[in-house]
Amino acid sequence: MSTVVRIPRSVSWKGDAIAVLNQTKLPHSTEYKTLTTIEEVWKSIVMLEVRGAPAIGIVAAFGLALASKKYTTLHIEEFQKKFNRDCNYLGTSRPTAVNLFWAIDRMRESIQEITTIKEAQKILEEEALRIQQEDEAVCRSIGEHALTCFKDGDNILTICNAGSIATARYGTALAPFYIGKEKGVRLHAYACETRPVLQGGRLTTWELKQAGIDVTLITDNTAAHAIQTKEISAIIVGADRIVANGDTANKIGTMNLAILAKYFDIPFYVAAPLSTFDITKQTGAEIVIEERDETEVTKIFGKQVAPVGTTVYNPAFDVTPNELITGIITEKGIIRGDYKREIASLFKKTS
C-alpha cells in the first residue's frame, strides 16, 4: 500500500459541494470544510485553507463546476458570460500561483464549443475531475524522476509544504520521499518551519509523520548551520510559477536556500509539473509577487508579537534565478543546462 494513502486528501468533490482539508487547522485537528459557492471557494484559497499551487488549481476547477450548476439562465450565451465572470473572480484570489490560471483556462476551453447548458455543466464536472486525477499521476511521475537524484540515507532540506496536501496526492518536492519509502530508499527530510505561516512546521512535518518518514524541523535561520553540520546532501523545493528562462517563484525564503546551496556546493532542485510553467513570461522580473496581510508577521496564532503600528513587508514569494538551480524536475523528466532552450524544446514536444 502506498504511504500517501495515510494522508487525507486536500480536495474532494461531492457532486453538489467541495470538501477541502482545512490546512489552517493542522496539525492540531483534521477538519474538512464544505464549500457550496464560488465566493466560499475564493475565500478558502485566500485564507490558505486550501493551498499549494496544484491544489489551488484543483479547487478552482471544482469551484467553477459547482458554480455552473447554480446558474439560472436558460441561454448558453448568458451562461458563458456568468462563467467567464466567475473565472475572472477566482483569478483574483492568489496572483502568483500559475496553476490557478492554468486550471481556469482549461475549464474555459473545455466548453468553448458547447451549445447546451446541460452539456456544459456535465463537461465542466468531468474536466475538473480529470484535472485532479491527472495531477495525482503527474506528481507520482515527478517523484519517480526526483528519486534518481538521491540515494539511500540522504538528508534533504526543503521549505514550505510541497507535499501531498498541496496537490491531488504525492506532492512535488515531497514526492520522492513517498516513492522512496515504497521502494526501500530511506530519505530524511529537514523541514524549514517557513515563517510567517509555518507551512513547514505545521504541514510538512505533519504529513511526513503520517507516512512514517523521518523528518527534522528547523527554524528558517538554522538552514546554513544545518547544511554545515548535518550532512545535508541536497535541497528540493516546489514552485508556484516557473518562467521561460527557468527563473522560479516559490515560497519566500527559497532564494535564501538556493544561495546557500551554491555556497556549500550541494544540488538545488525545483520540483513542479508542467502546469506550473508560464512560458509567456521571459524572466522572473515579470512575475507578480503577492503581498499578504501584515498581521501574519505581527501576530503569531492571534497574539501580537510586534509593537502595534510596526511597518511590515510581507511578500509571499521570492524568485530564484535560474543560475542557482541544479535541475527542474517535471513529470517528463529533469530539465538541466540551458533552461531557456530546454524549456522551449520540452513545450514544443508536448504541444
Swiss-Prot record:
Enzyme Commission numbers on file: 5.3.1.23
Biological processes, Gene Ontology terms: L-methionine salvage from methylthioadenosine
Binding residues annotated for substrate, in chain numbering: 51-53, 94, 199, 250-251
Chemical reaction(s) catalysed: 5-(methylsulfanyl)-alpha-D-ribose 1-phosphate = 5-(methylsulfanyl)-D-ribulose 1-phosphate
Top EC group: isomerase
Active site (UniProt): 240
Site (Transition state stabilizer): 160
Keywords: Amino-acid biosynthesis, Isomerase, Methionine biosynthesis
InterPro entries the record matches: IF-2B-related (IPR000649), IF-M1Pi (IPR005251), IF_2B-like_C (IPR042529), Initiation_fac_2B_a/b/d (IPR011559), M1Pi_N (IPR027363), NagB/RpiA_transferase-like (IPR037171)
GO molecular function per UniProt: S-methyl-5-thioribose-1-phosphate isomerase activity
Assembly notes: Homodimer.
Family: Belongs to the EIF-2B alpha/beta/delta subunits family. MtnA subfamily.
Function: Catalyzes the interconversion of methylthioribose-1-phosphate (MTR-1-P) into methylthioribulose-1-phosphate (MTRu-1-P).
Name of this protein: Methylthioribose-1-phosphate isomerase
Organism: Bacillus anthracis
